[in-house]
Amino acid sequence: MEQIAARVTYINLSPDELIQHAVKNGEGVLSSTGALAVTTGKRTGRSPKDRFIVKDEQTADQVAWGNINQPVEQRTFDQLWERALRYLSERAVYISHLQVGADDNYFLPLKVVTEFAWHNLFACDLFIRPSGDHANGKPSWVILSAPGLKTDPERDGVNSDGAVMINLSQRRVLLVGMPYAGEMKKAMFSVLNYLLPPHDVLPMHCAANAGQSGDVALFFGLSGTGKTTLSADPHRFLIGDDEHGWSATSVFNFEGGCYAKCIDLSQEREPMIWNAIRHGAIMENVVLDENGVPDYADARLTQNSRAAYPREYIPLRVENNRGRPPDAVLFLTCDLDGVLPPVALLTKEQAAYYFLSGYTALVGSTEVGSVKGVTSTFSTCFGAPFFPRPPTVYAELLMKRIEATGCQVYLVNTGWTGGAYGEGGERFSIPTTRAIVNAVLSGKLKEGPTEVLSGFNLTIPKSALGVDDHLLNPRKTWEDVSAYDARAQRLIQKFRENFEKFKVLAAIREAGPSDVH
């Protein structure tokens, strides 16, 4: 176990104690909800250009190196790690012993060492707090977080005044100059996404919940497309809202908490999330008024305002944080063009195609320096920034799991209909999408009459309980059908161009869109 020398060391403090320290240290203030409110300066989202993975003998041929998985030399990592240790040795540090992964076979023990008390509270909220010594002899991973230490690009071999470095061989994650807490959780997500596939476990950027009978649903999607909102269902039990593994026998959460977007949060639309923001939770970059009352509509700090809270704050949850293999898999896509249907039933080849494509939108982007507003994107595996191995590794595992379980995969459009974004289209309302999801989870959607949507070759239902029939075929929602066809053809061309980079079976490639007839 890594030994950390510090001026003062606080080990395994309770959430209450960490909150007291954070307030006393001036790291944040208590809001009217009881949640700790903090701000993170200029870094209000992830910094993908500042994320590195150590390239060594173990990782050289296993990682898909490039703009997402940027390589860094072992020597560069070691020098910065030592500098961070020296920096922290002159300060009070907070240490918590946690774990990631709710499965007894695949969990990782985790030691989180932070400069800020609130970062340690975040780790306690988001990771899993084990009961007793649960390491089972497994070696522990270490997160070292020193947000007050700045990097120098010339001296440290990095791109800015901050860096996230993942050392897969040494089981170390280093965060320097990174006040945005989400970097910690996504770094460990990347670690699991690297480690699990060789163990026949598919790591997934998805939410998961379970019905009264134990049936499990998975919700894949980028941030802001509906994972957290749709999985927080008043009639189902939450497993988790963001990161899961799918083994031959179960679906299990990687985390012990939730990290919900707060922009425009309302009690009426999202009561479970609203009620979870209380003492013990963290509000990150949420604007408060002079009385400490949060204004969730105020985006002056960022569109990516967040709340972190433990799973225990969701009353309807699966206690053991895992479930059986899924009965339904939903790919949430936010279509800005308004040409995709609100729901389609996918074959396993289509599932692989749309999984690899990851077509969606960046909504209130989670990344630093992104343009304001909404832009379309293709994000492989519905989470390209977090998957170190080649994308086909994950797609092949997905197809294997679909074949083994016979689960139905659905494409669900949480984006626009009747026209494009900013051009007369309207976004599907949350109640409409919830009705679609309810129809999917009831099992009735796949039993009813269907038709094929030309061009995309998608099988779509002709009716869905609680949804206007005319919404189900996107071509019928546009006043000008020729305008729909032209916009659809444009998107189809984007799909094709994006997919050229993948080396896949012909059956998967042919499952994609063809020309509009």
Swiss-Prot record:
Recorded GO MF terms: ATP binding; metal ion binding; phosphoenolpyruvate carboxykinase (ATP) activity
InterPro entries noted in UniProt: PEP_carboxykinase_ATP (IPR001272), PEP_carboxykinase_C (IPR013035), PEP_carboxykinase_N (IPR008210), PEPCK_ATP_CS (IPR015994)
Residues noted as binding ATP in the record, renumbered to the chain: 186, 205, 221-229, 270, 306, 433
Protein localization: Cytoplasm
Cofactor(s) required, per the database record: Mn(2+)
Domain of life: Bacteria
Binding site for Mn(2+): 186, 205, 242
Subunit and interaction comment: Monomer.
NCBIfam families, alphabetized: pckA, PRK09344.1-2, PRK09344.1-3, PRK09344.1-5
Descriptive protein name: Phosphoenolpyruvate carboxykinase (ATP)
Organism: Coxiella burnetii (strain RSA 493 / Nine Mile phase I)
Gene name for this UniProt entry: pckA
